Amino acid sequence: MHDILHIIKGEVDSTAATLRAYSHDASIFEVTPRAVIYPKTVGDIKKLIHFASKERQAGVDVSLTVRNAGTCMSGGPLSEGYIIDVSRHLNHIGHVDTEDRTLWV
C-alpha cells in the first residue's frame, strides 16, 4: 500500500472506519477491502492499473475495483482488494460534444 502512496496524487485510506463504510453497498453482502483509493486524475487511474499489472506479473494477487456512489444492489463494487472511489475527485463534467453526443466526466 505504501507503494501506491508514492505513485499517485490522490489519497489512500485504510482506517477501520473507512474500511467498514466501504465493506457494503445497497446489497446484502459485506466484504472488507484492503484499502480505499481516491484518485485525483485519470493519470492516477492509469498508474494504478500499471501498478496492479506489475504486481500480478511478480506473482502478487492485486485486485482493483472501481466504485462511485455505492448504491449498487448486487455487491458489484465490493472487493477484498483495493477499492477505487472516483466520486471524491473525478466528479465533474468536462468537455461536451453535442454533435458527437459524447461527454467527458
Predicted regions and their residues:
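Short small/polar-residue motifs
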Residues: 7-9, 89-92
